[in-house]
């Protein structure tokens, strides 16, 4: 029996959510450009859902916002939290209306395997631990990326980018002997360097999710 030419199947994906808190697009873009400059490759071509729940009026120029984001090579897949008027504008612009999903009561499965790297990760290098944790005995340099579907443990300085829970595992953590990262991310929630500096003083720490926000805890000496 021949296979059908198409199939419709359910699937879940981890998307970054851009929260717009002001209808002043010049101010929004100035702040966004500052964040993009800190981690340009991380956001390049990244699919985004735009959250408009903080905009309780209809004065936002959604068409202009879409054009400004596209000009920065960001891909808008839809909006969420919009007023009725803005939702209609979004549909006219070909954007999907995304409803927030319910939190699953079933905990994510434990990582099935661990990838161990016994060397420094240098600028331009990327290491990915699929379906498991990543343990690095060494430093992660500026411009390097380490990614894991599970947790990331770095027995050295983290100066590049670390993305744990890449497949959506919200229980994943990032542990490093020195937190100096350009970017850290767990299940799509991320901090740039400036956010990390507000919560850490370049010392050892454990970054985890607390609800939908990241937090950092000191490690016992």
UniProtKB/Swiss-Prot annotation:
Which controlled-vocabulary keywords does the entry list?
Cell cycle, Cell division, Septation
Q: Which GO terms describe its biological process?
A: cell morphogenesis; division septum assembly; regulation of cell division; regulation of cell septum assembly
Specify whether Cell cycle is a keyword of the entry: yes
Which N-terminal stretch is annotated as signal sequence?
none
Pfam families (alphabetical): MinC_C, MinC_N
The UniProt transmembrane annotation reads none
Q: What is this protein called?
A: Probable septum site-determining protein MinC
């Amino acid at each position: 029996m021949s296979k059908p030419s198409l199939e419709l199947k359910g699937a879940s994906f981890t998307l970054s959510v851009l929260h717009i808190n002001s209808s002043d697009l010049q101010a929004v873009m100035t702040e966004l450009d500052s964040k993009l400059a800190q981690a340009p490759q991380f956001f390049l071509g990244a699919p985004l859902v735009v959250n408009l729940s903080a905009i309780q009026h209809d004065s936002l120029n959604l068409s202009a916002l879409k054009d400004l984001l596209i000009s920065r090579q960001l891909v808008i897949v839809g909006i969420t939290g919009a007023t009725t008027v803005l939702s209609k504008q979004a549909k006219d612009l070909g954007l999907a209306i995304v409803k927030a999903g319910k939190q699953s009561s079933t905990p994510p499965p434990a990582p099935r395997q661990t990838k161990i790297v016994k060397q420094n990760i240098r600028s331009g290098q990327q290491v990915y631990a699929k379906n498991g944790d990543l343990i690095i005995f060494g430093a992660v340099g500026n411009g390097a990326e380490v990614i894991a579907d599970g947790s990331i443990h770095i027995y050295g300085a983290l100066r590049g980018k670390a993305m744990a829970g890449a497949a959506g595992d919200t229980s994943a953590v990032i542990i490093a002997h020195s937190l100096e990262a350009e970017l850290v991310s767990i299940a799509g929630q991320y901090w740039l360097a400036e956010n990390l500096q507000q919560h850490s003083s370049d010392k050892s720490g454990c970054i985890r999710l607390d609800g939908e926000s990241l937090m950092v805890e000191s490690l016992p000496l």
